[in-house]
Amino acid sequence: MNLLKSKGVALLGLVALASTGALGSEGDVDYRHYSMEAIGGHMQAIVKILRQEVPHNEQLSLHANAIADMARIAPDLFPKGSQGREALPAIWEQPEDFAEHLDAFHSAAEAFKKAAASGDAATIGSAIGGLGQSCKGCHDSYREE
């Protein structure tokens, strides 16, 4: 019975912390960080494939699809109260401009996804350039290095 009571007290404590935002904010910051690292990992894998450093051309679309999926959820990675790590305060101070950058990222990711599926080298090359520029544009304004 004591074990059950202590688990109940611990659960109530977690609920109380979550309702004050103490867990949510830190959790959101970590979630955003790892999500962005995942995007970066897919980009690095794509570069290896395009430079023919690895024999995995058939996996290009897999990585392109993953980035497009992550771009779709990118706005959810920056809820109010989740300031921290590399995210600059300008994200929440200039929400309209930041949203435009996220829209550009999503559009570029979708274009690269289509290009990767086409298999056309010129289209892929152009689309990866656009995707890289969309990442850079946002990072230059909204990410602390």
Language model regions located:
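N-terminal signal peptide c-region/cleavage motif recognized by signal peptidases
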Residues: 17-21
